[in-house]
């Protein structure tokens, strides 16, 4: 379904990150990451092509606001997948970004990501 699209996974949970990675690969996507910190995710975004992203709003080093900002600046569709409340800064700057609350099956997360990619014309 992802047709070899590179999908950035920014997730610091040791169980969720590999589960999402496997699910992306099972749906013919290429995993970029997973990144457990904002610094790592921004580095990957600077050096790798990314078609879309799944972002936990609280990573190991800080909240993901800088990553969300950079993704939006580049026009990369993304979704928030979190177990905590979305930080106000992310919610205020990106009110239209879907927020999925953990726990949630990976298939539901990826269905939502595909919908966002279609809205942004990454897939038609």
Description of each model-found segment:
Residues 1-6, 39, 90-91, 101, ...:
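Non-catalytic signal-transmission and effector/linker regions of two-component phosphorelay proteins
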Residues 46-48, 69-76:
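Conserved phosphotransfer cores of two-component systems
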Residues 55-72:
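Conserved phosphotransfer microenvironments
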Residues 97-99:
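Conserved phosphoryl-transfer motifs of two-component systems
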Residues 11:
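Conserved acidic carboxylate
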Residues 79-81:
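Hydrophobic/aromatic residues positioned on beta-strands within the core alpha/beta folds
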Residues 34-52:
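Acidic, metal-coordinating helix/loop segments flanking the phosphotransfer/catalytic sites
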Residues 14-33:
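Two-component/phosphorelay signaling modules centered on CheY-like receiver
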């Amino acid at each position: 379904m992802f047709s070899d699209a590179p999908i950035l996974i920014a997730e610091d949970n040791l169980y969720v990150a590999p589960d999402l990675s496997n699910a992306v690969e099972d749906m013919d996507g290429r995993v970029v990451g997973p990144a457990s910190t904002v610094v790592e995710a921004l580095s990957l975004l600077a050096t790798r092509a990314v078609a879309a992203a799944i972002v936990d709003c609280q990573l190991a080093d800080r909240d993901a606001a800088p990553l969300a900002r950079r993704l939006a600046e580049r026009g990369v569709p993304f979704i928030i997948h979190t177990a905590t409340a979305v930080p106000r800064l992310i919610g205020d700057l990106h009110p239209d970004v879907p927020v999925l609350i953990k726990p949630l099956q990976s298939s539901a997360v990826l269905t939502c990501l595909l919908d966002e990619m279609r809205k942004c014309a990454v897939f038609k």
